[in-house]
Amino acid sequence: MRISIFGLGYVGAVCAGCLSARGHDVVGVDISSTKIDLINNGKSPIVEPGLEELLQKGLATGKLRGTTDFAEAIRATDLSMICVGTPSKKNGDLELDYIESVCREIGYVLRDKNTRHTIVVRSTVLPGTVANVVIPILEDCSGKKAGVDFGVAVNPEFLRESTAIKDYDLPPMTVIGEFDKASGDVLQSLYEELDAPIIRKDIAVAEMIKYTCNVWHATKVTFANEIGNIAKAVGVDGREVMDVVCQDKALNLSQYYMRPGFAFGGSCLPKDVRALTYRAGSLDVDAPLLNSLMRSNTSQVQNAFDMVASYDTRKVALLGLSFKAGTDDLRESPLVELAEMLIGKGFDLSIFDSNVEYARVHGANKDYIESKIPHVSSLLNSDFDQVINDSDVIILGNRDERFRSLANKTPEGKRVIDLVGFMTNATTEDGRAEGICW
């Protein structure tokens, strides 16, 4: 494949070396003549183990060259990768000047280019950047239509400095965000030789995946550091603790808790978060990430309330009251908190939860229900159909399987708010179901 790479920093230089070494015809483009001279002399413009050897191989086989001539590079290739920097502004937003400049250069050349060209954004950009910045510039400068006259895609990179060559050759996954199917097909053919799953998504999803991965890595580092600081303060080696924590692949390092949805609750998590952060505070150990957990959890309950309040009705059904399906435990259930907020604001609330209904009459939680939340328990109704029929808005609160069908086939005249992820897609055909995080 004939590929031009714009920006020969850490991402662009590595891509140029790896792609040319795999037999692709690569033109590296940069405004810095110093970088171009280095590339053309087989020298790496960055410090990266193994890269110089790849660049030299590309030069020796005639598969790699560098230039400062943007137009010539675009005319000589079929696919352009944008790898320029997107540094932070003082306010934290991204500086997109380099992206915009490259897009203008590409667009002007495309105006007179008769063959199809695919533009791939590898630079890290926020969701909406390609749709609202990249494509409009390309279309305006070229006078052509994205997805028709030229292709557009996003291909986020997951390269770490000092291990970038290995990361390129052995990626955990290859993410392709495609504006048009043809562009996705082109990129898939480029990466099929790599032993990694190829995941094709919409462009905005791909943009968000990159940020989610990086923020998750930052969160893990911060979490481990805060746990380590607290552990040290109580006389424990935090490394020993985290080593054992990371051995649990069923829960600790798994997909189990990594699903967007409603707040956490129950008798353990809230209590233990409060206890550990209290101990940290008593030892003068700063743990801002851990201290934010309960506040963030409460915010998610508020989000659910706001969704209900956005509808012009007061008749609401809450399906599920315990913090998870299959239990009658109401201790610190976020659904109880949501119910109390709705009651306090005058909503006409009906609640269905077969486990809690049984517990109210027979279970060990009877005293808890009657003494702690009698105002909530009095709204429980064991007639599922009546609860549905008497409501205008239906909240799917836990993963009781009998609630699933309501998410994808909303009853006539009703609205559904899905807190648990029963909806198959982010939207339904009738548009009457809405997810809290989708």
Curated annotation (Swiss-Prot):
Alphabetized GO MF terms: GDP-mannose 6-dehydrogenase activity; NAD binding
Keyword entries, A-Z:
Alginate biosynthesis, NAD, Oxidoreductase
Q: What induces it?
A: By oxidative compounds such as H(2)O(2).
A biological process (GO) of this protein is:
alginic acid biosynthetic process
Pathway annotation: Glycan biosynthesis; alginate biosynthesis
**EC annotation?**
1.1.1.132
Report which superkingdom the organism of origin falls in.
Bacteria
One Pfam family, short name:
UDPG_MGDP_dh_N
| Reaction(s) the record says it catalyses | GDP-alpha-D-mannose + 2 NAD(+) + H2O = GDP-alpha-D-mannuronate + 2 NADH + 3 H(+)
Residues of the active site: 268
The UniProt record lists the keyword Repeat: no
Q: Where does NAD(+) bind?
A: 10-11, 30, 35, 86, 124, 271, 331
Record carries keyword Acyltransferase: no
Q: Where does GDP-alpha-D-mannuronate bind?
A: 161, 210, 214, 217, 225, 256-257, 259, 262, 265, 324
Give the family this protein belongs to, as stated in its UniProt record. Belongs to the UDP-glucose/GDP-mannose dehydrogenase family.
The family database entries (PANTHER family) matched by this protein are listed as:
GDP-MANNOSE 6-DEHYDROGENASE, UDP-GLUCOSE 6-DEHYDROGENASE TUAD
Function of the protein: Catalyzes the oxidation of guanosine diphospho-D-mannose (GDP-D-mannose) to GDP-D-mannuronic acid, a precursor for alginate polymerization. The alginate layer causes a mucoid phenotype and provides a protective barrier against host immune defenses and antibiotics.
Q: What is this protein called?
A: GDP-mannose 6-dehydrogenase
Organism annotation: Pseudomonas syringae pv. tomato (strain ATCC BAA-871 / DC3000)
- What gene is it encoded by? algD
